[in-house]
């Protein structure tokens, strides 16, 4: 049976309140939304202009947060997928958002870039106080930054659990997931 459910974000429940809250939420898609022919700065200038943000203040701040302040001077266009991913995260941070939503943040990256992106996500949480909602199939990396997990299968919420409980019940997040899926299929 369908259940439309409800959403509450930063204390807001109505459509109007939720619409106003969108400025506090940044989204990082699984494939880059950056204009490949433009530099990181040019991409961010476009977003600042669209969203009415002070580019002179925001761009240096977000580039520094994601470690692109040096990289952006190297090229007039964005070629490397790791740089695109950092730029996508910088874009999501524009306006000093409180909640970041990631869809497969390390999708398509090589092992070193994967490690780097997950380290960045953890640092943004610890040092900047950003709340993260992360959709990922990379359970080992996810376990390194998560404080709690929500398990969804075929559109159905299976379980929500803290990482402390998960660590008490299984040697790894992957093993916890295996056990959960085995129980569901019975």
Regions found by a protein language model. Name each.
Residues 45, 56-71:
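Conserved ABC ATPase "signature" region
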Residues 89:
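Hydrophobic anchor residue at the start of the ABC signature
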Residues 100-103:
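Catalytic Walker B motif of ABC-type/P-loop ATPase nucleotide-binding domains
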Residues 115-127:
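Helical segment within the ABC ATPase nucleotide-binding domain
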């Amino acid at each position: 049976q369908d259940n439309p459910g409800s959403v509450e974000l930063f204390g807001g429940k109505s459509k109007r309140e939720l619409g106003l809250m969108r400025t506090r939420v940044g989204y990082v898609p699984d494939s880059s939304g950056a204009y490949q022919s433009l530099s990181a700065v040019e991409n961010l200038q476009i977003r600042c202009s669209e969203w009415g943000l002070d580019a002179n203040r925001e761009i240096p701040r977000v580039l520094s947060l994601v470690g692109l302040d040096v990289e952006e001077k190297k090229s007039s266009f964005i070629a490397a997928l790791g740089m695109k991913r950092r730029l996508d995260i910088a874009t999501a941070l524009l306006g000093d958002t409180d909640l970041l939503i990631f869809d497969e943040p390390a999708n398509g990256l090589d092992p070193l870039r994967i490690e780097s992106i997950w380290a960045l996500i953890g640092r943004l949480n610890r040092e900047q106080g950003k709340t993260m909602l992360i959709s990922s199939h990379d359970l080992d990396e996810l376990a390194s930054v998560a404080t709690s997990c929500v398990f969804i299968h075929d559109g159905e919420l299976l379980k929500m659990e803290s990482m402390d409980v998960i660590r008490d019940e299984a040697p790894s997040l992957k093993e916890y997931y295996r056990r959960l899926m085995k129980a569901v299929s019975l």
